[in-house]
Amino acid sequence: QGKNLTQAMGATNFISTIKGKSENTLTSTPDEELLKMLRDKLSKDSFETNIRLVVSAENKIRSESIFLEMANSFVQFSSNKTNSFKLVRTKKGAFDELIYKYSFRLFDESQKNVLGIEELTSIFHFPTPLTKTPNISGVKSKVSAPPTNIPKEGLLLGYNIYREEKKDIYIKKDDRRRHMYIIGQTGTGKSSLLSSMALQDIKNGEGIGMLDPHGDLIDDILSKMPEERIEDIVLFDPTNLERSIGLNMLEYDPRFPEQKTFIVNEMINILDKLYDLRQTGGPMFEQYARNALMLLMDDPNEIYTLMEIPKVLADDNFRKRLLSKCKNFLVKEFWEKQAEQAGGEGALRNMVPYITSKFDNFISNDYMRSIIGQTKSTFNFREIIDSKKVFLVNLSKGRLGELNSSLLGLIITSKLSLAAFSRVDIPEDQRNDFYLYMDEFQNFATNTISTVLSEARKYRLSLIISHQFIAQLPEGIRDAVFGNVGTIASFRVGAEDAKFLEKEFEPIFNSQDLMNIDNFNFYIKMMIDGQTSKPFNIKTYPPKKGDYKLANDIKEYYSLTYARSRYIIDEEIRRRRVDI
């Protein structure tokens, strides 16, 4: 299907024409199918082309026969509704000119045809990777021009080159508040983009949090840390066996007693995320765990930790002492009239190992015990957000194990969300922006992420979340992400993900493009001034080299200044368990 195709052999040409269309037909109500075809063609790259056929043979009869076979092959492109090709005889005087233009590949404006990529590949079959054709370079994936209203300033994501015009691509602060989702296979450049974005925020004086399940991203950021922001660093590195940072999940702000309910609900969600409570827990587990947590948090004089959960269940004296100070009548009623009175399989003594087994993995682990066993967290999450700190969290699964890494990440995500929501006590226009980067975020997301994504904007908590493939996400989290995220970026993905993402990027890009885009390139559907843009492509700038001695110096300084000796912490935990 072409606009105006001319072909030649000797004195013979092709032209394209619309056949059999009366004036009434062309001016009547538009054909929906035809309009769809027009829109489809206009949405893709097109090229001005000349197409010429030249045949050389041992005699005229043979050359004419070959030519007619070639000419007849264009009949397949004819359509009653769209363009067709028609054979036209060329005058003798034009023959030499035609051969000359063919020989030197000279473009003839008078015979140009506007053909789309699909039309060109239907007429001429380009070489495949299996075809040995020298001096031919191929394009594995399409490119597209950025929108005309692309911001001139903001956070730099990379650059776009379209028809030899290079343009830097920025995203505005307000558009970032609608969150950003990044997907791509390992090694495609996601970490490079995250590092670039985070370092720009740091240099601009913004507050950021970075949850890194591998540790490499944290090292990269520390190695490039601006000198003026070193004092703003809050480094959480649980992989240090000698010195520990404290993180108490049960700690809350007394000014906001409603936080207790949020913490308990999040703790249940975290356990469900880690153990799939539908299969391994059930309503009895949730009931006992919920009331044990509420009982510990209702003591007005003491701060407890997850270490005391087994003691609530197994130590009658300890539980009775807590109940004597408990003001929550529902919690008291559960323990005094249900749990302690139950018999048979539901008896409290039978429930103890059932409940505590879910906590033993953390309590008995050398890495975890000295972190979650401290009554006071080393840092204040609200202060981290309000004071624009650089909060870096090394959750290396290789050192901690996947379960412990996930638990700490889930607790920290919950704490940051709670701190952000507590900013209801200050006017919205006085809330500082805080950017939370989460690599492999599926490890740190519970079902409440839909609430975070929908509500965090007003509290100035902006999420940048990334992972490798969609199957990592439970259906509820997947729907929450694609239903609430404003900006979607896709590096190269596999076949299944390409099919899923195609609907986000069509008609500009298809699944083949998503599967074949080069490393350090990505497709993006970006939020611009509160509106979703048409998809286009971006290439990231190459990362600069860092100073890893600086990174190690920062880690050592922070460990000596803020972390505590594990020996001292273990001794405190031992004494506390004896005293209570």
Question: Where are the regions that the model predicts?
Answer:
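An aromatic-glycine-centered, glycine-rich loop/turn in mixed alpha/beta architecture
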Residues: 20, 41-163, 364-366, 519
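P-loop NTPase motor domains
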Residues: 156-166, 173-175, 180, 185-186, ...
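Short amphipathic beta-strand starts and helix->beta connectors
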Residues: 28-41, 188-196, 377, 473
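Short, flexible, solvent-exposed loop/turn segments with mixed acidic/basic and small polar residues
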Residues: 39-47, 196-201, 478-481
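C-terminal anchoring/interaction modules
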Residues: 532, 546-580
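Conserved ATP-driven motor cores of ASCE-family P-loop NTPases powering translocation/secretion/packaging/pilus
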Residues: 73-80, 105, 110-115, 223-225, ...
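Structural signature for extended repeat/solenoid scaffolds and their inter-repeat hinge/linker regions
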Residues: 1-37
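Short cationic amphipathic helices and targeting signals
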Residues: 49-56, 208-210, 488-491
